[in-house]
Amino acid sequence: YLVQNGICPRVLAMDVNEGPLARAKEHIREAGLSAYIETRLSDGLSAMKWVEEAGADGGTGADGETLHGEVFRGEALRGEVLRKSRPEADTLLMAGIGGRLAARILENGAQKLFRMRTVIVQPQSELQLVRRTLNRLGYRIEAEDMVKEDGKFYTAILARNVRMAGSGEDGSSMADAVDI
């Protein structure tokens, strides 16, 4: 949907289980979107790579190995790698998982989330836990809406990184980028 409607030029689809990932890959191939959507086996955000920030002036490389396993818990980020690299995605979309799992993924991926602009999450349970986790990690909830899927209602939450509040790289407002 995101690629087909020009909302997102590139998507990284990740899942911890091979079966759902294989089915997703088949749907992507059938839709002719393999050039735009990459799939990876991943526990949370662990398979999301770090890329060198545009304009970085050398220094420590952004190979991902340097940061692997570190956990950010609200303190100031340390090290040249963190200042000169970013995760390969600027938006995280999570749907179809419970709130406890969503909160765990957010907590375990906190260092990458520190450099991402937007989180969209549709937890199937424990909304308060997800809201508190987003808040603790420096995200402000900007919108919530009910979504009906297969006869069930779910809450979709749009949250923005307060450290990057207000604009995209081109200076445009992020408010128009996602309509939940």
Q: What positions do the PLM features span?
A:
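Conserved SAM-binding loop of SAM-dependent methyltransferases across substrates and taxa
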Residues: 1-8
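Conserved SAM/SAH-binding beta-strand->alpha-helix loop
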Residues: 17-19
